[in-house]
């Protein structure tokens, strides 16, 4: 998508062949830097990073960037443990750098329209809300995005990645949840797990 006021200055990926494709496509003026080492990229003169790496790496990579003096836009979710969340918050507070989690679901056209109506006052005050996010995928599609049992998507409880469901209510109403309850149906045996936080 087009975004004014920004310039793609550097890209980091563990796979050099991917970097070559990106450089060929986006290095229009010959200044795009490419790195296979994230720490080396952080030494460069860039202002901010966009983290689109694996879920379980987000907090570590964000904290490194903040401590290197970079602003951070992180794909969701921000962390995989409470301890990582605390460390991430501390890094933001200590560095004074801007951090944003890039939860995209609240910014779809439908949710933006609901927010407009809610902000107008037509709906009144929100006292209770429910949200859901259903993303059914075939086994082949699931394997494409999570190949193998050791892929991060297969190593976390499903409710750890609940941002699509809850972020839309938080954004529309500009509120924080008091209590959250969730369950994950199991397609294979139709059982489910319930989590409450």
Regions of interest found by a model, annotated:
Residues 36, 74, 103, 181-184:
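Short loop/edge segments at beta-strand edges and connector loops
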Residues 105-193:
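Predominantly a Rossmann-like dinucleotide-binding segment in NAD(P)-dependent oxidoreductases
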Residues 46-48, 54-55, 59-106, 121:
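Beta-strand-loop-alpha-helix segment that lines the small-molecule cofactor/substrate pocket
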Residues 21, 40, 48, 60, ...:
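Alpha-helical elements of Rossmann-like donor-binding domains used by nucleotide-donor carbohydrate transfer enzymes
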Residues 52-53, 133:
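Glycine-rich, N-terminal phosphate-binding loop of Rossmann-like dinucleotide-binding domains
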Residues 31-44:
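Short acidic low-complexity segments
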Residues 10, 48, 128:
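Short, Asp-centered acidic motifs that coordinate Mg2+ and/or phosphate
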Residues 1-29:
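N-terminal Rossmann-like dinucleotide-binding module
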């Amino acid at each position: 998508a087009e975004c004014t006021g920004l310039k793609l200055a550097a890209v980091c990926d563990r796979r050099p062949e991917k970097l070559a494709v990106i450089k060929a496509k986006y290095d229009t003026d010959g200044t795009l830097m490419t790195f296979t080492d994230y720490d080396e990229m952080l030494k460069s003169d860039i202002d901010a990073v966009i983290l689109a790496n694996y879920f379980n790496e987000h907090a570590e990579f964000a904290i490194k960037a903040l401590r290197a003096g970079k602003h951070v836009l992180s794909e969701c979710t921000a962390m995989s443990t409470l301890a990582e969340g605390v460390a991430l918050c501390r890094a933001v507070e200590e560095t004074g750098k801007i951090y944003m989690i890039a939860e995209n679901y609240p910014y779809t056209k439908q949710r933006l329209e609901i927010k407009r109506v809610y902000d107008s006052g037509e709906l009144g005050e929100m006292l209770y809300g429910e949200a859901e996010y259903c993303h059914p995928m075939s086994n082949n599609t699931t394997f494409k995005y999570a190949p193998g049992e050791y892929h991060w998507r297969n190593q976390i409880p499903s409710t750890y990645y609940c941002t699509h469901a809850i972020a839309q209510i938080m954004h529309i109403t500009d509120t924080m949840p008091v209590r959250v309850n969730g369950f994950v149906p199991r397609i294979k045996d139709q059982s489910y797990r319930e989590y409450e936080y």
